[in-house]
Amino acid sequence: MKNQYLHIKTKELNFKAKLLWDDAPETCEAILKILPLTGKLMQTRWSGFGVWIDLGEVEIDEVPFENHSIYLAKGEIMFYPGFESMKEIVIPYDKVAFASKAGLHPANHFATIEDSSDISELGRRVIEEGLQPVIFDIK
């Protein structure tokens, strides 16, 4: 399982993210159980330069904070377990300080996109075109 990859597919953009089993094992396990996951990516409201998918209707295991941070860089995928608000996955396309209207929140960094050269384009599309369909899966 050490070299497992999360595949993220939008309309025309595809990303491959290495799961961080050594740093966030419970989060990786919980995410695997909900795959394949389809939904819509939207622009973050409070956090900066990122897109996110709401997991509100998805049955996902409770996980502790692990490998958690408030600040993430381009391509560092995080899972917010929903302790203060809804559960979500966030993909930064630049710097993110994960927050809600209640303030800053730590989230679990569980995967990192290997080639993030197109991630800024994903951010641009979400801003200019609106919601983007997405599929998360393991191949």
Task: Identify what each model region corresponds to.
Residues 1-23:
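N-terminal intrinsically disordered, low-complexity, charge/repeat-rich segments that act as generic
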Residues 19-139:
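Glycine-rich active-site loops that engage anionic ligands at enzyme catalytic sites
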